[in-house]
Amino acid sequence: MSIRPDEISTVLKDKIANYESQVDVYEVGTVLYIGDGIARVHGLENVMANELVEFPGEIYGMALNLEEDNVGCVLLGEYSHIKEGDQVKRTGRIIEVPVGDDLVGRVVNPVGEPRDGKGPIEATDFRPVETRAPGVIDRKPVEEPLQTGLKAIDSMIPIGRGQRELIIGDRGTGKSAIGIDTILNQKDSDVYCIYVAIGQKKSTVAQVVDVLERHGAMDYTTVVAATADEPAPLLYLAPYAGCSMGEKFMHEGKHVLVVYDDLSKHAASYRELSLLLRRPPGREAYPGDIFYLHSRLLERAAKLNDENGGGSLTALPIIETQAGDVSAYIPTNVISITDGQIYLISDLFHAGQRPAVDVGISVSRVGGSAQLKGMKQVSGTLRLDLAQYRELEAFAQFGTDLDKSTQQKLARGKRTFEILKQDQYQPMPVADQIVIIFCATHGLLDDLEVEQIKEFEKFLLSYVKDNEPGIYQQVETGEKISDELEDQLKEVINKAKEQFKEEKELTG
């Protein structure tokens, strides 16, 4: 076998000409300490704040503390196999989450991984979890209503699209129920919903998802679940991730509702991270930037102007108080950031007044301008009537002889409170609310027994829809009620009342 030098040289030249060097360049560091979900890493000289870093076994962490000689990272997964001396790689990416239509109807964790067993999420669009809130010039005033379907809220504490309305109260007063009812009420509207569960039991989240599925609400809802057994960094990321998913729709000119359930646990998870990273503690051991934690989240709720698509993101943050103390650190912070609060009290809840809204301390600072004209008109005196009733009720407990007008106010107050009661998962269309609140504020329920009110409410609404659809359609527009329509409504309600009483006598 003869070797031909010219052939060898041709092959070598060809190989050299087509040689491509593939060198992967990483900036790597070394683990100095690992424990309690925190890693101290040396050598990541150019790492960015909040950058994603990769640990062995495809476990990711987030760089939170950039110190002189090391980086404090929080780990976003199981870290028992990571040890001192392991290599850590920079990714050059800030934490992002998948966004878009692929997430609608899904249950995901705060980094966008599916948790519902329905297969992978094929999202092609991603957004950083932390983004800047829209500027003053990009916004417009809140002017469109967001109906909750709850009479007590839509009449006295109206919420507008783009508003931030805090739901605050003790444990077990029905805070989550208001958030879920509001999501259920968006069924026939154009609002996408995102429910962010922070630090809740898996069984509770499963129950919420089941309710949403049974009522057909998962067709327009995404659930972001960071359950109680997840590491603190995931609980910390959850609301920002949910907000980013909503912002995608907002910037497309659509409308979004985000329920954060709840920000008390979110603050506790951030306190845990901060103390483990040895940041100096302040009041109630929270770090100094705890206000900024929530303000930068809630400022992302906005109503964009027409040049930016006119989309909106409405936020309903939930805060749990201890023994009704709204003057604690986190409650006062969030009250000052939001555009109003719905305050729920346990006394009303246990007395059977559900939703247990305290109308005296609850307020909506911007929602009034978004309220439907018809609702504004019929519920104008409602808050005052209820406040007077509460005062007189306390006075009447002394057993004093009361004059006729006081007795009348007490009787009307009882009936008004009765119509504001509502069962869970039964949001009411706004036209139904206007009709029934019209009855209360015009004294048309005064001659009925308190026990008959709920029954009469159902009877009246079906009577109006069946016998006077024209009147119902006029009310449905939400426009101001004319004198003529007011007279027609009174006439229809009185007819319905007569028929109701006759039927009662026959069956009684």
Curated annotation (Swiss-Prot):
One cellular component (GO) term of this entry: proton-transporting ATP synthase complex
Enzyme class: translocase
Pfam families: ATP-synt_ab, ATP-synt_ab_C, ATP-synt_ab_N
Membrane topology of this protein: Peripheral membrane protein
Location in the cell: Cell membrane
PROSITE patterns per the UniProt record, alphabetical: ATPASE_ALPHA_BETA (PS00152)
Reactions that this protein is recorded to catalyse: ATP + H2O + 4 H(+)(in) = ADP + phosphate + 5 H(+)(out)
Binding site for ATP: 169-176
Example of a GO MF term: ATP binding
Sorted UniProt keywords: ATP synthesis, ATP-binding, Cell membrane, CF(1), Hydrogen ion transport, Ion transport, Membrane, Nucleotide-binding, Translocase, Transport
Main location: membrane
Site feature location: Required for activity: 362
The EC number(s) this enzyme carries: 7.1.2.2
The protein's assembly and partners: F-type ATPases have 2 components, CF(1) - the catalytic core - and CF(0) - the membrane proton channel. CF(1) has five subunits: alpha(3), beta(3), gamma(1), delta(1), epsilon(1). CF(0) has three main subunits: a(1), b(2) and c(9-12). The alpha and beta chains form an alternating ring which encloses part of the gamma chain. CF(1) is attached to CF(0) by a central stalk formed by the gamma and epsilon chains, while a peripheral stalk is formed by the delta and b chains.
Alphabetical list of NCBIfam families matching this protein: atpA, PRK13343.1
Classification via PANTHER family: ATP SYNTHASE SUBUNIT ALPHA, MITOCHONDRIAL (PTHR48082:SF2)
Function: Produces ATP from ADP in the presence of a proton gradient across the membrane. The alpha chain is a regulatory subunit.
Family that this chain belongs to: Belongs to the ATPase alpha/beta chains family.
UniProt-recorded name of the protein: ATP synthase subunit alpha
Organism, as annotated: Natranaerobius thermophilus (strain ATCC BAA-1301 / DSM 18059 / JW/NM-WN-LF)
